Regions:
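Non-catalytic accessory segments flanking enzyme active sites
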Residues: 3, 7-99, 123, 129-133, ...
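Structured core elements
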Residues: 10, 29-31, 44, 75, ...
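Active-site donor-binding loop signature of nucleotide-sugar glycosyltransferases
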Residues: 13, 57, 78, 109, ...
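Short, glycine-/Ser/Thr-/acidic-enriched flexible segments
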Residues: 36, 49, 81, 92-95, ...
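Short, solvent-exposed loop/turn and secondary-structure capping segments
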Residues: 41, 99-100, 114-119, 149-152, ...
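Short coil/turn segments at beta-strand junctions that form active-site/ligand-binding loops
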Residues: 99-101, 187-188
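The serine-hydrolase catalytic nucleophile loop
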Residues: 100-101, 109-128, 143
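Active-site-proximal cap/loop segments of hydrolase catalytic domains
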Residues: 106, 124-134, 140-246
C-alpha cells in the first residue's frame, strides 16, 4: 500500500491467521501463519508475497503422542437468535463418543480482547488443554461485546461492563453444541477464568445457577470501581462516585 493509501494489494490469500512484521527499511516481512489446529509456519516474504526463506514449519506429532488433539473451531448462534458467534471446543483425551462428558468453560470476556481466536497460540490455550487431559470437554466462546469483530458487535455491552461477552450467548452456544454433539453433558457445566474471566465466572454461577453448576473465579476484578478504573471507563463510560458495575 502506498503512503497516500492507494495501491492496496493483498499478498496472502488463504484461510490462515497471519501475524506479520516488517523491518523499518522495508523490503520484506516475517510472517507467522496458523489456524487453531495448525501450528504457525514462519516464513520471510518479499513485497509480492513470495516466500524467500522458510524459517520453521512445526508439526503436532509429539503432542498427539501424548494424547493431545487440536481444538475444533465452531460457529454458533447468539442468544438473540441471529448473530453468529465463534468458539473453540477441546475433546477430552481418550475421547469416546459413546460416553457423556462434563463441560468446563474457560472464559475471558474482554471487552478489550477476545478469547477464542483463530490462531494456534491464542491466550490461555493451556488451561482448556489441561482440562481435556483430565477427561473434561472444554470450551471457549466469544459472545457479543468482545473485540475483533464489528463496532456494533463490540459495543453490545458498552455501558454494561458486567455483561461483557454476553453470558447468555455463552449458554446459547453450549446448548447448541449439546444438540450437535450428544456426548456433551450440558447438565454438568462448570466455568472458570481469571481477572475479567474470574469476574465473569463468579457472575455466571450467581446469575445462571440453573446452568453453571460450579465456578472457580481466579483473581476476579469484582469491583471495577477500584480495579483499573481507567480501563473500565473505556468500556463503561465515566464512573460516577460510588458506582457499582453489576
Amino acid at each position: 500500500i502506498n503512503l497516500d493509501g492507494s495501491g492496496f494489494t493483498r499478498i496472502t490469500d488463504d484461510h490462515l491467521d497471519h501475524d506479520a512484521v516488517s523491518p523499518p527499511e522495508g523490503g520484506y516481512l516475517v510472517d507467522r501463519a496458523s489456524t487453531s489446529n495448525q501450528p504457525a509456519r514462519s516464513v520471510v516474504l518479499d513485497g509480492d508475497g513470495e516466500v524467500m526463506v522458510e524459517l520453521e514449519s512445526p508439526g503436532t506429532v509429539g503432542l498427539e503422542a501424548l494424547g493431545w488433539s487440536p481444538p475444533e473451531r465452531f460457529r454458533a448462534t447468539a442468544a438473540d437468535g441471529k448473530t453468529p458467534i465463534y468458539g473453540l471446543l477441546w475433546r477430552p483425551h481418550g475421547f469416546d463418543p459413546q460416553r457423556r462428558y462434563p463441560v468446563i468453560e474457560h472464559i475471558y470476556p474482554g471487552p478489550q480482547n477476545f478469547r477464542a481466536g483463530p490462531s494456534f497460540n491464542e491466550m490461555h490455550h493451556g488451561e482448556p488443554e489441561a482440562y481435556a487431559a483430565l477427561g473434561f470437554a472444554a470450551v471457549a466462546i466469544d459472545g457479543r461485546g468482545t473485540a475483533g469483530r464489528s463496532k456494533a458487535f463490540h459495543d453490545h455491552s458498552y455501558g454494561d461492563l458486567g455483561n461483557a461477552g454476553a453470558l447468555d450467548d455463552h449458554i446459547a452456544a453450549i446448548r447448541e453444541l449439546g444438540q450437535r454433539y450428544p456426548w456433551l453433558d450440558t447438565e454438568r457445566v462448570g466455568i472458570t477464568g481469571q481477572s475479567a474471566g474470574g469476574f465473569a465466572a463468579a457472575r455466571a454461577v450467581l446469575r445462571y445457577p440453573e446452568f453453571y453448576k460450579v465456578a472457580v473465579a481466579v483473581s476476579g476484578n469484582h469491583d471495577n470501581g477500584v480495579n483499573l478504573t481507567m480501563w473500565a471507563e473505556h468500556y463503561f463510560a465515566i464512573l460516577a462516585a460510588n458506582a457499582v458495575i453489576d
